[in-house]
């Protein structure tokens, strides 16, 4: 019975992963992610029902589009598998007894699934385009508010702590919209700050601090490796160019998931 439950959760996670790849591709292009059918990005042919099974479709089709025979990037398969494994890992770590499932545990798991969706989409878009998209941040704050309401009503949590987070979120959002919208660098930093607030709401201060620490270490290693690469290849890449290649949102997402696990 347990094996069947874990397989089902893995498949649900893989389906989420399939949706994440769609969202990562469409959100920066301002395309609809809910009503428009999936299509091949190479030939634009709409995909059939049997073309969209997570993992299986990729394997059966040999990593190619059924219609134009162009290769499909392996990131689709990788993200679906990773998503499935992470969903299973979270279920296992929460120690949910499948023979005595409690509503509170199911609610917590659902909130965690929504939160992981936020991280995956942020990471995917940032890795591809180095952007923290506002629609994704808006989604993050919406699920945060719902989660706060749940904690305060059901678990009688201290609401003042979360109110402080929301106040900071609104202040940064106002600054980003009014004062700093002309500066791409500041806009990106503000997006990172808003992302950190959502992380803190869902995972608490301790995990957030560890996430920031591990991300800082990762960024430092990245910069050091780039400097060494510059010296070896005698590259003229400036610090400004290194900054432009630095995907902090991606690193934050990855380190936060690893810290949770």
Residue ranges and their predicted role:
Residues 1-261:
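A membrane-topology feature that recognizes alpha-helical transmembrane segments
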